[in-house]
Amino acid sequence: MKLEMICTGEEVLAGQIVDTNAAWFASTMMEHGVEIQRRVTVGDRLEDLIAVFQERSLHADVILVNGGLGPTSDDMSALAMAKAKGEPLVENVEWRERLEEWFTRNNREMPLSNLKQAMLPASAVMVDNPVGTACGFRVKLNRAWLFFTPGVPFELKHMVTEQFVPFIRDEFNLDSKVALKKLLTIGQGESALADKLEPLELPEGITIGYRSSMPHIEIKIFARGEKAIAVLPRVAGHIKMVLGTAVVAEDKATLAEEIHYKLLNSGLTLSVAESCTGGMITSQLVDFSGSSSYLQHGLVTYSNESKVRVLGVNPSTLDDHGAVSIATVEEMAKGARQILDSDYALATSGIAGPDGGTDEKPVGTVAIALATRGGVYSQMIKLPRRSRDLVRSLSAAVAYDMLRRELLAEAVIVDYQSIGRFSK
């Protein structure tokens, strides 16, 4: 099966918004053992949409079209599809009634413009959208099925999961015997990881893929077929052993997710004091439901005054060692933990750049501490200075990993290949 994707919208084409839908769809399909072979982005111009539908339908077996199903004049996907096939738009009575019910249920009067969303190409098969007003549909043109979805990410994800994936499995008799194991890593680049894994002799049906999403590199281990699926846990275990401390989570999208579930299930509490990470550690945990059960407070103590007045850092510590130092970050972590008697506290202070570095403490210098009831662990690391965001996100990841290792009763301070460390 040859799968393609057509993304629509002037704002996507012009780079005014990042097309996260395309990235999510490609990743999701990969997890189902299907690779996208081509992706095209086209603006909201009728003639361009018609041309791309006609041209790509000659080559693909199935095309997911995303966007252009709204009620406004620049939403042209349905009209373009009808013209590409040479047929009229007709009202889908079932969807019009669904629209009327939706507006009535929400105590709103339906604008006349929304009736446009019930107008589909004459040969279209309606595809349910259970969470929005845009009607999905599919149409056969030339050799391809074109499957139309709304641009709203939440709606797209529902339709792909509940409608699109079952459709292509049935239509193209895809083998459902596919399994996937994900390993999340930090501290090593993609090429360094590949150098370690390429020499491995993998069993038949097992393949390895890489996805860079800084500060992580995600390793995807695919197993296709019953025999490969049976040995997948063993293969994943061997790969973890080869990579050592670089692997920080298994089958989690982020290290924050790993920490969230470990704290949620442990009954232990956490406080956070952040300087250079500016609330990033706290924010990433709050993304997950239930974080209030363990996250007691997150403090952004950016100035020296706030470190002294809020966390109790000794002014002489700042005078003698500076804000970016082991001594300061240890006092920050201790102070954050003591405020509410948390089980753990993380603290960060660093130079994210692009300015502010010195010969002694260049941009990318970050001090991180973990305070526990039994003591404090700390380190001052040297991070790649490619961007301010990378320094901050890597700092958060290393802080998370220190806590993760403490929760597992492992060595808290470990070496990462691409992250240096200052001696205390």
Swiss-Prot record:
Pfam families: CinA (PF02464), MoCF_biosynth (PF00994)
InterPro entries, per database record: CinA (IPR050101), CinA-like_C (IPR036653), CinA_C (IPR008136), Competence-induced_CinA (IPR008135), MoaB/Mog-like_dom_sf (IPR036425), MoaB/Mog_dom (IPR001453)
SMART domains (UniProt xref): MoCF_biosynth
Gene3D superfamilies (UniProt xref): 3.30.70.2860, CinA-like, MoaB/Mog-like domain
NCBIfam families xref list: cinA_nterm, PncC_domain
Family: Belongs to the CinA family.
Protein name (Swiss-Prot/TrEMBL): CinA-like protein
UniProt organism field: Shewanella baltica (strain OS155 / ATCC BAA-1091)
